[in-house]
């Protein structure tokens, strides 16, 4: 029962020396290259981001070290959050397009059978 109530940490924030908010490493647990590379792409589209990269420390670990460094003192949390939101939007668009295509295919198939 205790295992059910325990909640694993899925995201940690590790700040660089000097407690500067513009240079942060986010540790994402239970994730791999699928999220890492997609999120890196979305974050790098932001012109305020100076550096963005990720690493997986060991092949047997399921965590990503995701680092963001911004320009002009902008907190790294902002482009991280924006990148996640944009990635969700892209995934939602792909899902909607896929579902629409499936629906159209089924309608065409039914029309051809009549």
UniProtKB/Swiss-Prot annotation:
Record-annotated disulphide pairs: none
The name on file for this protein is DNA-directed RNA polymerases I and III subunit RPAC2
Q: Name one GO biological process term.
A: transcription by RNA polymerase III
SUPFAM superfamilies hit by this protein: RBP11-like subunits of RNA polymerase
Q: What does this protein do?
A: DNA-dependent RNA polymerase catalyzes the transcription of DNA into RNA using the four ribonucleoside triphosphates as substrates. Common core component of RNA polymerases I and III which synthesize ribosomal RNA precursors and small RNAs, such as 5S rRNA and tRNAs, respectively.
Pfam families documented for this protein: RNA_pol_L_2
Family as reported in the entry's similarity comment: Belongs to the archaeal Rpo11/eukaryotic RPB11/RPC19 RNA polymerase subunit family.
Give the main localization category: nucleus
Which keywords are on file for this protein? DNA-directed RNA polymerase, Nucleus, Transcription
Compartments reported by the entry: Nucleus
Q: Which InterPro entries match?
A: RBP11-like, RBP11-like_dimer, RNA_pol_Rpb11_13-16kDa_CS, RNAP_AC19, Rpo11-like
UniProt-listed Gene3D superfamilies: RNA polymerase, RBP11-like subunit
Instruction: Indicate the quaternary assembly.
Output: Component of the RNA polymerase I (Pol I) and RNA polymerase III (Pol III) complexes consisting of at least 13 and 17 subunits, respectively.
**TM annotation in the entry:** none
Q: Per the record, GO CC terms?
A: RNA polymerase I complex; RNA polymerase III complex
* Encoding gene, per UniProt annotation: polr1d
Gene Ontology MF, one: DNA binding
């Amino acid at each position: 029962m205790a295992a059910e109530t325990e909640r694993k940490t899925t995201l940690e924030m590790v700040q660089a020396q000097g407690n500067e908010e513009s240079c942060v490493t986010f540790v994402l647990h239970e994730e791999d290259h699928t999220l890492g590379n997609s999120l890196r792409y979305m974050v790098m589209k932001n012109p305020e981001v100076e550096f963005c990269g990720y690493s997986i420390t060991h092949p047997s670990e399921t965590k990503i070290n995701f680092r963001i460094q911004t320009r002009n003192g902008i907190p790294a949390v902002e482009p991280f959050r924006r990148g996640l939101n944009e990635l969700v939007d892209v995934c939602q668009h792909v899902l909607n397009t896929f579902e629409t295509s499936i629906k159209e295919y089924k309608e065409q198939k039914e029309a051809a059978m009549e």
